Amino acid sequence: MGEKEKVIAHGNVARQINKNLRRERIFNIAKNQIAKKGLEAFTIAELAQEAGVSTPTIHNLFGKKSDIIKELVSNLIEQMQGNSLNPPIDPIENAKFFVDNVVATFEQDTDFYRAALMSAEQLRLFDPRIPDGLFQRAQQVAAPRKDWYEAGLFLGNIEPSTIMKKVHNSNRLGRIDWVSGYIDLNQFRHKAMMGILLVYASDASPEFH
């Protein structure tokens, strides 16, 4: 590579870094606006104004308003998956580990996560009919582990996919109640744990019971 090509390549890298930093800054502004105002009051125009950029720039960086919400919730799901990389082997401790991580995440910024998840529901981003959508990604976090069957903790009389769906549903229903303001996070923890453990009990071996 010649000197000129090196300069051009360096310039391209620098521009991409600056673009990513600007995008991250605007993304954080969007998070704050959604947390304070909710979905209905959140607009691309106001986001652009506070960020000091043009509306077309926002569209170029993120797309539509719904795309921003989808990315926010996608990041949340990725965070949940990252938090679950080294879970306990015991199913009960695993369930507690998972639910505690969800609660701890929500506690970091209650207003934002409630607003973002409410927005996602309103925009139907959790519609199970969307191929490879948020619903399917969230379900994968709830999948039972293969070593539970290998250790004889689960009998295998119920399809793992069914257990995954029911565990995810226990978390989802509790989350919807929390987002709607019907329960607090402690009640969410209790509701989600009870639902998950009842699902596990339906296929647990006598020894595990």
What are these regions (language model features)?
Residues 106-128, 143, 176:
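Amphipathic alpha-helical segments used for helix-helix packing
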Residues 37-38, 59-71:
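HTH DNA-binding helix-turn interface
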Residues 125-153, 158-172, 176:
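Amphipathic alpha-helical packing segments from all-alpha helical-bundle domains
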Residues 26-34, 76, 102, 106:
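Short hydrophobic clusters on alpha-helical segments that form packing/core surfaces
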Residues 1-37, 44-50, 67:
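Basic, helix-initiating cap at the start of DNA-binding domains
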Residues 1-9, 104, 143-147, 170, ...:
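C-terminal peripheral helix-coil segments that are non-catalytic and often amphipathic
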Residues 84-111, 163-167, 189:
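Hydrophobic alpha-helical connector segments
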